[in-house]
């Protein structure tokens, strides 16, 4: 069965909404005439001071009960530590996926297997119950989104999570033992063989301390290639590896596609 299209970027939805709104504003603002509305709808328009453009904009986002949105947005929850799923065009919030932070209302992090998942993401022996989620990314097949998994990174604590989209549930959190923070998102290679996590700020490797006077000698960046086992739906830490980089500040890091396949 063909999966419904999934969209990761909030900006895409916002841009589309902006274009629709701009088109509506340019139309002549008449009340209850051009859209062929029933008398009851016309009465509502008059009572509420709505224009045809207002009603048209509302209809563009309306999805009746029992019908599905055409697209989904997977938005980072920032310092909530979780992911938010919204439908497009309705913009309804369909789901909050608990990832790095406990969510008692959905039973995440308050007992059972979810406690073990959160414990997996401990850093330096400390159990973490907060995060700063940035740039979630969908799994890919031949460089195209396949909607099977989504990966999220914790910018504040250098961790990556695996979410299975069969049930929209977090299955694994891995902690990066090399770096203090990341900002490379959790981008994947074209067939999701690896999830790429890069450090944001240069720091001594191994999450240790060194004075700035030793910056050139001890401060470094890192790109980690987490090996993903698609059959198990888990990152295989034993088959993962890292590349040491110079001590510069890094931002997003994705894998190449088509002519740039094999580069990152």
Set out the residue ranges of the language-model regions:
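Bacterial N-terminal signal peptides that target proteins for export
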Residues: 1-10
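Bacterial N-terminal signal peptides
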Residues: 9-18
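Bacterial signal peptide processing site
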Residues: 21, 25-28
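A short beta-strand motif characteristic of beta-propeller blades
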Residues: 49-53, 92-96, 125-130, 169-176, ...
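Repeated scaffold domains used in trafficking and secretory/extracellular systems
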Residues: 56-62, 103-111, 128-142, 178-190, ...
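Short, conserved, GDST-rich strand-edge loop motifs in beta-rich repeat architectures
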Residues: 60-70, 135-138, 147, 197-220
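Short coil/turn segments that connect the beta-strands within blades of beta-propeller domains
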Residues: 69-71, 147-148, 191-193, 261-263
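Beta-propeller domains
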Residues: 76-121, 152-177, 228-236
């Amino acid at each position: 069965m063909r999966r419904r299209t999934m969209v990761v970027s909030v900006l895409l939805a916002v841009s589309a909404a902006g274009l629709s709104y701009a088109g509506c504003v340019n139309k002549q603002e008449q009340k209850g005439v051009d859209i062929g509305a029933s008398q009851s709808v016309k009465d509502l328009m008059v009572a509420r001071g709505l224009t045809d453009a207002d009603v048209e904009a509302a209809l563009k986002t309306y999805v009746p009960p029992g019908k599905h949105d055409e697209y989904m947005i997977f938005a980072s929850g920032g310092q909530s530590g979780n992911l938010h799923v919204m439908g497009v065009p309705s913009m309804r919030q369909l789901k909050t996926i608990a990832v790095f932070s406990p969510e008692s209302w959905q039973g995440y992090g308050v007992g059972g297997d979810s406690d073990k998942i959160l414990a997996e993401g401990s850093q330096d022996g400390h159990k973490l119950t907060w995060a700063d989620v940035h740039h979630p990314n969908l799994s890919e097949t031949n460089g195209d989104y396949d909607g099977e998994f989504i990966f999220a990174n914790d910018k504040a604590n250098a961790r990556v999570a695996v979410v299975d989209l069969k049930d929209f549930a977090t299955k694994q959190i891995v902690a990066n033992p090399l770096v203090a923070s990341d900002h490379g998102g959790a981008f994947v290679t074209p067939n999701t063989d690896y999830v790429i996590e890069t450090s944001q700020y240069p720091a001594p490797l191994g999450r240790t301390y060194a004075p700035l006077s030793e910056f050139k000698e001890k401060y470094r960046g890192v790109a980690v290639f987490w090996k993903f086992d698609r059959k198990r739906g888990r990152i295989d830490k034993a088959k993962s590896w890292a590349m040491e980089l110079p001590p510069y500040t890094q931002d997003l890091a994705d894998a190449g596609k088509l002519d740039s396949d094999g580069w990152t």
